From Swiss-Prot:
Lineage: superkingdom: Bacteria
GO cellular component terms attached to this protein's record: cytoplasm
UniProt xrefs under PROSITE patterns: COPROGEN_OXIDASE (PS01021)
The protein, known as: Oxygen-dependent coproporphyrinogen-III oxidase
Residues the UniProt record annotates as site (Important for dimerization): H179
Record EC number: 1.3.3.3
Complexes and interactors: Homodimer.
InterPro entries linked to this entry: Coprogen_oxidase_aer, Coprogen_oxidase_aer_sf, Coprogen_oxidase_CS
């Protein structure tokens, strides 16, 4: 396993965490200033993994972001025998290293889309990058969806013109609730097992995916910051959030990986919405 690669990837995810938290806090500050409220701030909680590694969960519950979490973690050790066959390159000795960032935002306003993002670097006897981002609006708008997709398409096209259509298709296939036969949202990109043979290029691509999120999602939130909504719209949001819960508990790879590696339960389940209704 490459020590330098582990260090620089972990450092980037920490840096991206700081940039995102700062941007989200600025949005809360702006809203609080106009409304005469005290702005919410992120609360950070550190955790350690018994088998090796640690993480930091940053959580903010405010007036704009009903719940937004930004998790970073770096964990290592050995998979148990029962899981080794499920992870690429872990079949022989089960050793692994994983570092990454995971972001999930649930907004109070039903007019502002929920967002999920994660990028990660994993080493076993193999090594690869993975990640992506998707948008879940409760009241989809074509222009907003196009803006979100364009940001990630531009990041992809810098490296390979085949990336965006491939990763968009993978996102559509991945974020699909098979038991309901419906998509979770309006998509985005999703990639896994990315190893072109050029670590520097793959790492640069993963950094640019993070920068794409930073450029587009805060802008979407700000554009709808002061739009009024109705009780009926809020009720619909709470019901649709149930789909989010179903996906994360039934299909999400990150949730499964966290449980397989004995990760922090609060951090693993951070992605769940704060309030949900099931009808």
């Amino acid at each position: 396993m490459n020590t330098e690669n582990k260090e620089i990837t972990s450092n980037w995810f920490t840096n991206l965490r700081d940039l995102l938290c700062k941007e989200f806090e600025k949005i809360e500050e702006k809203y609080a200033q106009i409304k005469g409220l005290k702005p919410a701030k992120f609360v950070r909680t550190s955790w350690k993994r018994n088998g090796g590694g640690c993480g930091i969960m940053s959580l903010m519950k405010g007036e704009v972001f009903e719940k937004v979490g930004v998790n970073i973690s770096t964990v290592f050790g050995e998979f148990s025998q029962e899981f080794r066959s499920e992870i690429l390159g872990a079949e022989l000795d089960g050793k692994f290293f994983a570092t990454g960032i995971s972001v999930v935002a649930h907004l109070k306003s039903p007019l502002i889309p929920a967002m999920h993002f994660n990028t990660r670097y994993i080493e076993t006897s193999k090594n690869w990058f993975g990640g992506g981002s998707d948008l879940t609006p409760f009241y989809p708008e074509e222009n907003e969806t196009a803006k979100f997709h364009t940001a990630f398409k531009e990041a992809c096209d810098k490296y390979d013109s085949s990336y965006y259509p491939k990763f968009k298709r993978q996102c559509d296939e991945y974020f699909y609730l098979r038991h309901r036969k419906e998509p979770r949202g309006v998509g985005g990109i999703f990639y896994d097992y990315l190893n072109s043979g050029n670590f520097e290029q793959d790492f640069a691509f993963t950094r640019d995916i993070g920068k794409a999120l930073l450029s587009v999602y805060p802008e979407i939130v700000r554009s709808k910051l002061f739009l009024p909504w109705t009780d009926e719209q809020k009720e619909y949001q709470l019901i649709k959030r149930g789909r989010y819960v179903e996906f994360n508990l039934l299909y999400d790879r990150g949730t499964k990986f966290g449980l397989m590696t004995d990760g922090n339960i609060e951090a693993i389940l951070m992605s769940l919405p704060p309030v949900v209704k099931f009808n």
